[in-house]
Amino acid sequence: GTDGNSISSDWPKLAGQNQKYLYEQLQYFKDGVRMNALMMSVTPYLQTLDDEDLLDIAAFYSNYETSVGQAKNDEELLNIGTQLYRFGNMKKGIPACTSCHAVYGQGNSLAGFPAVAGQQIGYLTSTLKAYRSKERNTGELSEMMQSIAQNLSDDEIDALANYMHGLYQ
């Protein structure tokens, strides 16, 4: 949407996203480092913009308030998602998501960790799977996420996406 709150589950919500993270991702798309079928139509436009334009776009969307998501009321899904997000699973090499994305999913803007609270389920699912398959490979943060996501099953990814979609402060 025009306020950065996507109505499609496959498209990310940009509203309220950390400015540094948005800027970096726009730069990756512009430079052709990050590829995504949904962004193919926008990439040529991004290539006409300078750094100041990208910073302005990132600031624009980061200043909007993200809409609140509603997690599916599935007890097993919520239990798995809650456990992984808050505490991780050290036996599987999965640290708590709160370590980088914070308790309420607001991320860490100084470190460049994205906000995940209220993010679209479809987008979260496809992103975690892209990290797991190493299809998404832009920067050091991607390497960190790849090493975590490779240890997640499809069911755990679904549970995490559902849990994060329902996070709010």
Enumerate the language-model features and the residues they cover.
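The canonical Cys-X-X-Cys-His
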Residues: G1-G4, I57, I94-V103, L160, ...
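Axial heme c-ligation environment in periplasmic c-type cytochrome domains
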Residues: I7-L14, F29-N73, S109-A115, S133-A159, ...
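Extended amphipathic alpha-helical interaction segments
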Residues: Q70-K91, A96-Q106
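Sequence context of c-type cytochrome heme-c attachment sites
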Residues: G1, S9, M39-V42, G81-G88
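Sequence context surrounding c-type heme c attachment/ligation sites in exported
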Residues: Q19, R86-T98, F113, A117-S126, ...
